[in-house]
């Protein structure tokens, strides 16, 4: 939390009231101040019967007025907080994370939704922070030092290597601890912020971290969601229980139906039916086929040598669910 004790709503009021009514309206609507989202130049122009370019001119005139020495002195404590917030996170923060968390950092009691737009305005007015537009590899970012961009690229490259080698997601704390050894001068907050900046890395619904393209991270259908919940629970489940777990996880508003789950999993090579309606993962060592077929495979792998009844049952239970 900030130590400035400044009242962000009071600063917002003082800044905006110095503008003409139309300029106030343009700034408020363009930045979404007090609203859930910002408006386009076109929609604002339609209100006043003016062109998009004229709206842009009014916006720029308003921003120029807000950058006067008197106004900047009013918001300097907020600028200091903003720069400290970014600095504590390695000098770089993803835009949507910054807009979500900065207001709470200043004032935990403030309405984050209504003040998101004001945070965006502060970013535009502060000459000490820069914006990096989103691209194929990174989200839109705000940074205080250019070296932070290079540090983020270096760390993200290492994270991607770790995941490509492991071919499996990890809990974020494990990854951060591993990266702390590779980058000892980066704080844990900086490492987390750099990871968040990458489009190639994401969290799944259970908080595991992995490559965005993996179905375990961003499941795209019932089959992927089923795979994720069964793997997370670590045991074979009936298709009705799998449907229940998918719905409890709240992946989306769409309800998973038991019969749909059954129909999808019976065709999916990652799953094997190991009992009446029970599905397990092939990667756990279970085998497809009837009990007779599984027994035949066991004898084949043991080159036909005699096995005691106890050993046979033990090997069978590793391949089939009782």
Residue ranges, per PLM feature:
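C-terminal non-catalytic scaffold/interaction domains in large multidomain proteins
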Residues: 1-322
């Amino acid at each position: 939390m900030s130590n400035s004790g400044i009242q962000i709503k009071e600063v917002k009021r003082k800044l905006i009231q110095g503008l003409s009514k139309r300029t106030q309206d343009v700034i408020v609507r363009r930045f979404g101040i007090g609203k859930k989202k910002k408006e386009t130049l076109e929609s604002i122009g339609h209100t006043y019967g003016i062109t998009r370019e004229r709206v842009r001119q009014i916006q720029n005139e308003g921003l120029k007025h807000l950058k006067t020495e008197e106004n900047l002195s009013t918001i300097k404590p907020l600028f200091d907080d903003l720069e400290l917030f970014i600095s504590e996170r390695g000098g770089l923060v993803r835009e949507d994370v910054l807009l979500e968390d900065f207001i709470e950092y200043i004032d935990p009691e403030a309405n984050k939704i209504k003040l998101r737009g004001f945070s965006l305005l502060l970013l535009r007015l502060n000459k000490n922070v820069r914006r990096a537009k989103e691209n194929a590899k990174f989200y839109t970012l705000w940074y205080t030092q250019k070296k932070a961009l290079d540090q983020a690229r270096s760390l993200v490259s290492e994270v991607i290597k770790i995941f490509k080698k492991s071919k499996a997601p990890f809990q974020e704390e494990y990854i951060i601890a591993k990266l702390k050894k590779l980058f000892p001068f980066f704080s844990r907050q900086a490492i987390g912020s750099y990871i968040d900046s990458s489009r190639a890395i994401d969290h799944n619904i259970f908080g595991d971290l992995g490559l965005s393209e993996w179905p375990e991270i961003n499941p795209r259908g019932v089959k992927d969601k089923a795979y994720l919940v069964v793997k997370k629970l670590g045991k074979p489940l009936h298709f009705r229980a799998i449907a229940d777990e998918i719905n409890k996880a709240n992946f989306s508003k769409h309800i998973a139906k038991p019969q749909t789950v059954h129909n999808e999993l019976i065709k999916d090579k990652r799953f094997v039916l190991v009992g009446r309606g029970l599905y397990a993962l092939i990667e756990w060592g279970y085998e497809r086929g009837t009990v007779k077929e599984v027994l035949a495979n066991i004898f084949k792998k043991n080159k036909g040598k005699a096995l005691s009844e106890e050993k046979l049952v033990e090997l069978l239970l590793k391949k089939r669910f009782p």
